[in-house]
Design a protein with these regions (language model features):
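Charged, low-complexity C-terminal accessory regions
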Residues: 91-163
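A conditional alpha-helix N-cap/helix-loop micro-motif detector
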Residues: 27-28, 64-67
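S-adenosyl-L-methionine
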Residues: 1-41
């Protein structure tokens, strides 16, 4: 998003300056240029904020296997580096309206996917954002809901990988 850097600086610039934090924003396609960015910044950690779940929309619907391969390749590219992501896992309509003041469901680690979707009041069909294999095995992943609108929820995943 070409406006992201401007909006981030507008919203957080004062706090960044107060702490002496230096912010560098790359406005190119960071995923396409990831190998070069990683090489140029060997000590930098990487955070994907609402990026990885959107990749399926940059390809034709028939190229879902290509999207999955690209997402799995990230684990290889980022091996040995600290990185994290917050992304959509699935999204879709709900069987009943979501009250504005309702608590956001958080997934219990023992729940299987279908039970979790039941807790979200998911009404088929839900869109699979193809991010089920983003994180390496063994990484603690938090699953929680985000109420996009009164009748539509997103299942979000967040995780942080340490080398």
């Amino acid at each position: 998003d070409p406006r992201a850097a401007l909006l981030f600086k507008w919203r957080h610039g004062k706090a960044l300056r107060a702490t002496g934090t230096e912010l560098h924003c790359n406005t190119r396609d960071a995923l396409q240029d990831l190998p070069a960015l990683l090489s140029a910044n060997p000590k930098a950690c990487v955070f994907f904020d609402n990026v990885l779940g959107q990749l399926r929309f940059q390809n034709p619907a028939t190229d879902w296997q290509q999207v999955e391969r690209r997402l799995k390749q990230l684990k290889v590219q980022l091996k040995g580096r600290e990185w994290g992501s917050l992304h959509d896992r699935m999204s879709g309509p709900c069987t009943r309206p979501i009250a504005l003041d309702s608590a956001l469901p958080v997934r219990h680690p023992d729940w299987h996917d279908q039970y979790w979707l039941t807790q979200l009041d998911a009404q088929s069909p839900w869109l699979d954002h193809l991010t089920q294999d983003v994180f390496p095995t063994g990484v603690s992943v938090q699953n929680f809901a985000w109420n996009f609108s009164a009748n539509y929820r997103h299942w979000l995943q967040a995780g942080w990988v340490r080398p």
